Amino acid sequence: MPTMIKKDDKAMEPPNEKPHRKIERDDVPESSNHIPPPESGVLKGGKVNSKTRALKAVTSIIADADENPQKKVNNETNGVQKQKTEDLSKRIGKFEYLFYKFLLVLLYICFGLFRYGQYQYNKMKLRIFSIIYNHAYTPQLIRQDVIPLKKIPKRLAAILEVKPVGDVGGGVTGLLNDASEIVCWTVSAGIKHLMLYDYDGILQRNVPELRMEIHSNLAKYFGPAHVPNYAVKIPHSNKIFYNLDGIETETDVGNEIEANQEKDKIAIEISLLSNRDGRETIVDLTKTMAELCAVNELSVSDITMDLVDSELKQLVGPEPDLLLYFGPSLDLQGFPPWHIRLTEFYWEKDNNEVIYSVFIRGLRQYAGCKVNVGK
């Protein structure tokens, strides 16, 4: 049996070397990439085996264990209170929504009832005025309504619009009839200048039909043998259509002598306007003046307010003294803005018909108004 050789520990040590020293835990350097666990934060800053640090660590753990249940209870209490607050806010918000909705509906109903009453009142007033001011297709009755007035307009304008075809007096035929009725009232009142404005220019495109309608209604008012002479003027196309003793003729505006001779014989001059005669005319005039200035045919110093005013009067016509609108609320619909600086407006609320009572009441209002130029 082989003999076990017992080696001496000292003999195993390499020569000339110091004996190994026991390495303590705190002497081992930590890696720079090492992420310590959360618990090591309590032990940071000194030796682990120090009694003070160990006592602090144990105390901190015990304190955390005592605080966690208290925090949990507080969090649960706060959650319950927050939930109650949210529920209360939802209930209050729903109540406010229902309250304001009810208030809005109530206000809407009150306004609707008020507006309905106002509409019926205005309609009843118009019916009463229609009974009081009834011309009965007689020029003498119209003259009797006009004679008491202190003054009447020299130039009258009216804004007309096309109604739906399905309505009474709708379509192009209704528009032509309304225009001819206003012409008859104007002639009977002794007014010699009338402007008829419709936005789309339907009257300008239907001049032959309009002249026939005017002649027919004038014959109804004055009799077939005493139809007044009239002239229909279209400023945009520089044309004037005359009707003399039932004979219709067409005269170009450029023929001044013939136009002036026939103008003295007519009872009324009717100008047909559209949106083309409004702002577009002012723009075209401005472009023309700019082109003349560019070629030195017109000096900038020559462009004055009087020049612009005279040119617009020649292109569109003079400014009317009274403007009638046969609609529920005033809507100028692009009427030439240059020509209404001193014009008196008149319309009846909730009215959408061309009726004589609006015409004569407009004249009565003009007779009582005072125009202060520049004051």
UniProtKB/Swiss-Prot annotation:
Its main location: endoplasmic reticulum. One of its GO terms (biological process) is protein glycosylation. Coiled coil: none annotated. It is an enzyme of class 2 (transferase). InterPro entries: Nus1/NgBR, UPP_synth-like_sf. Residues 1-28 have a biased composition (Basic and acidic residues). This is Dehydrodolichyl diphosphate synthase complex subunit NUS1. It comes from Saccharomyces cerevisiae (strain ATCC 204508 / S288c).
